[in-house]
Amino acid sequence: AYPVASDVSIQRVINLAKNSNFIIRLDNLDGAALINKAAADAGITIQYTIIVNAGLNRFGLKPDKVVEFADAMKQFANLKFVGVSSHPGHVYSATKHDEIAKYVADEKNSVATAVKGLEAAGYKLDIVSTGSTPTFWGSLDDENIKIYHPGNYVFCDYIQMSIDIAKEEECALAVYATIISHPDEETY
C-alpha cells in the first residue's frame, strides 16, 4: 500500500472509477485534493474509505483523529465517504503464535474507536474492513468488522509458518534451490 499522488497513478484511479465500483483508501488531505480535482475534471465521484492506523505506523490515521479527518474531507465534492479500513501489519513483528492475540486486540480496538467516533458524529459506514493473515481467525467475532482482507491467507508462506499460522504443506508454492557457495558465516 502506498499513496496515490503521481499524475499517472491518479489517472489509473480515474479510469478504474469510471469502469468499476472502485474504492480508494485515503489518509491525507493533500492526496485527497489531487484525486478530487482529477475526479471533478473527469465528471465522476470516487468512493473512499479512511485508513485507520491499527499500530503498524506505516499509514493511516490514529483512531481518535478519524472524525476530524472525515469532517475535513467534506470539502471535496467528488469524493464520497463509504467507511473505514485498516491493516494490522505490525503483527508480523510477532515471533511466536502466542503473541498474535495482542495484535488482534490492537486491530479490534482501533477499528472500534474509529467506528464509534464516526457513528457518534453522524457518519454512516457501509464498509468496515481490515485484515491480515495472522489476525484473521482472532478477529472474526468482532462486532464492527464487516469485510476481511486476510492478505496472503490463500497462499501462505514462510512468515505464516514461523508464527504457526500455516504448515509447510499448506503453502501454495515451494521453491527448491541448490546452494552453490557458502564460504563463511557472513556471506549469504
What spans do the regions from the language model cover?
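Active-site-proximal beta-alpha core segment in soluble small-molecule metabolic enzymes
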Residues: A1-S93
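Active-site anion/phosphate-binding pocket segments in diverse small-molecule metabolic enzymes
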Residues: D98, K102-Y188
